[in-house]
């Protein structure tokens, strides 16, 4: 194999596929990036058997071939090469010479034939969204997946298609995030659970352009995200997702409309008095026209009052401040509506069209003086 491409193209391609290289594995071939110049295009691929990423890079193929290079060594070499054309050539015993201007690296490689290729997915059952929409949906839900594997289902997100609506749901046992988007066409009903890790890596790849489109296709075991050049294939999480509809009551005893940034800034200031790992709640005292926020810790205490529009009963309720901050940060509206039933029932933050819904469970607290 002998190929030539620019350093910038190579760096970009390696950076994209490296996200699918496992940090730990007992199979050395999975620590590799496959450089495939066996056809008329140069493709780079990485695959940890759960998540696989392939991308095409521009370049010239002088001699066709295929090779698997250790991802860590390859990416570090490529990153530190001069900004010029890079030549990659292999010998019959899988030695690989990487040349750029006067720099020459000769490294051992593995046969590309041993590499685990991405599964071939027939593109039959798929939807199309913009890169911007996909990036936003991930940003507005990913923070509420569980960060450990105690319950595998909670480490993923539900993608549910019904008609022309895509609903994305995440939860961790303390909160639920729901984002709904309208698709341009109607599609067959579908429910799949996508690993959170896959979505986190995709969000790093997406440029977020409103005009660029992504095709998302489904099989029984896999989901595929097809961008302009990169293709991401991920295993799905098996099982039936949590039944959350019964938790999403539209009843409320108290409704508050408030300026989002003002509330977010106030809670953010309050967290200055909380040490990392400290689970001190923020107490919210809702009365006619005002919301008072109070917090007390070993460091000190703080209270602040914000003007609001209120419907219904007065209420005193406590929350983990981080959960409120996480939800408010991803809402783009200037004003938000908060719905409460009582001090032991969840708070709902949602818009009139319910394009987003954030459910946050309250916490027990001792009244802050």
Where are these regions (language model features)?
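Structural preference for solvent-exposed beta-strand-turn elements
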Residues: 1-369
């Amino acid at each position: 194999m002998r190929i030539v491409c620019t350093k910038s193209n190579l760096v970009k391609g390696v950076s994209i596929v490296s996200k699918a290289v496992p940090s730990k594995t007992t199979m050395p071939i999975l620590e590799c990036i496959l450089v495939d110049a066996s056809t008329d295009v140069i493709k780079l691929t990485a695959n940890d058997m759960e998540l696989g990423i392939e991308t095409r890079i521009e370049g010239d193929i002088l001699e066709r071939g295929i090779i698997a290079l250790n991802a860590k060594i390859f990416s570090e070499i490529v990153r530190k090469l001069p900004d010029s054309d890079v030549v990659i050539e292999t010998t019959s015993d899988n030695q690989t010479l990487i040349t750029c201007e006067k720099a020459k690296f000769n490294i051992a490689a593995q046969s590309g034939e041993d590499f685990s290729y991405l599964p071939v997915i027939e593109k039959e059952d798929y939807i199309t969204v913009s890169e911007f929409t996909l990036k936003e949906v991930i940003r507005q839900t990913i923070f509420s997946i569980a960060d450990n594997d105690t319950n595998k289902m909670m480490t993923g997100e539900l993608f549910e298609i019904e008609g022309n609506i895509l609903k994305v749901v995440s939860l961790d046992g303390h909160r639920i995030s729901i984002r709904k988007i309208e698709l341009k066409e109607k599609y067959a009903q579908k429910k799949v659970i996508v690993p959170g890790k896959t979505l986190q890596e995709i969000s790093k790849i997406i440029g977020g352009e409103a005009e660029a489109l992504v095709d998302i296709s489904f099989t029984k075991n896999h989901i595929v995200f097809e961008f302009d050049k990169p293709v991401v294939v991920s295993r799905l999480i098996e099982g039936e997702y949590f039944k959350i509809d019964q938790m999403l009551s539209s009843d409320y005893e108290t409704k508050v409309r408030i300026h989002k940034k003002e509330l977010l800034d106030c809670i953010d200031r309050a967290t200055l008095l909380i040490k990392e790992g400290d689970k001190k709640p923020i107490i919210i005292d809702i009365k006619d026209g005002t919301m008072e926020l109070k917090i007390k810790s070993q460091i000190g205490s703080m209270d602040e009052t914000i003007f609001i529009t209120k419907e219904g009963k007065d209420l005193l309720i406590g929350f983990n401040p981080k959960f409120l901050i996480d939800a408010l940060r991803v809402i783009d509206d200037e004003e938000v509506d908060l719905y409460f039933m009582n001090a032991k029932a969840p708070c709902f933050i949602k818009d009139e069209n319910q394009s987003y819904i954030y459910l946050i469970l309250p916490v027990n607290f001792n009244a802050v003086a």
